[in-house]
Amino acid sequence: MTQLFVKQVIEGCTAGLPAQIKYYTQFNQPVKIIDDTLSEVIGAVINNTLCGGSGGGGWDACDGGEQKNSSHVQSKFCADCGKKVSFFAEHCPHCGCSGFKAKSKQKGTKVTNPRDGRWGISAKSHFQYKEELKEYRLSLVEPLSDDHNCREFRFTYWTLDKNSEHLDLYAQAQLNSKKSNHINFQPYGVDFYLSRPVMKFTGVLTVHEDRTEFDFDFFDLDNNTPLEIPAEFACKDSKSVVESKKFGKERGEWVRN
């Protein structure tokens, strides 16, 4: 599938964002820059397949691909009244305060975006349907700044091998846990890098007053080289990382497709 067509799909399907940001924010409704449905469409486009049309059952794509989408364009908390407020709000719609914080119990207003959106992967399904599964397809939306005026958002798409040794180890430990069946998979965390994701494309979506524009920074659908593990995780190994986890103590927001 051509790079130009992917660009056209993203821009065409996000064309309503200028109005959504304006009116959704007025009524304190969160705005999904690229929602789960669109992420599945994008996955189908670049893999030359069709969406599964499962509505919660079966694979997200007809070729056996499973799409996981997450976003760091997240709501914040009013520093005065404590209520949750849309990312794009300049003032709290409840009390008019202009100070915000990322967490309700946070001290100070320096950090306003939790950036803790995650992907949810079922440990049970990972093993139960592994033969039919082709791969995991991960996508993430990130604001280039945490300011309410931000109109530029990075969108990145990776694939994750279903036979990843680290993912298998993590999933088995999670499955054996009595507390939860779900892997709370954090973008850019140690589990992410040790699972050896492969970037297929990344770019920036700009929301103009009357349209959107997507520009690629990288696009290679044939890329099979896993991301380089950052220096901070270079000394980590899967066994010790998984053994150090306190299973069942879920943090952050995760998207279940």
What are these language model-derived features?
Residues 1-59, 63, 67-257:
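Nucleic-acid endonuclease domains
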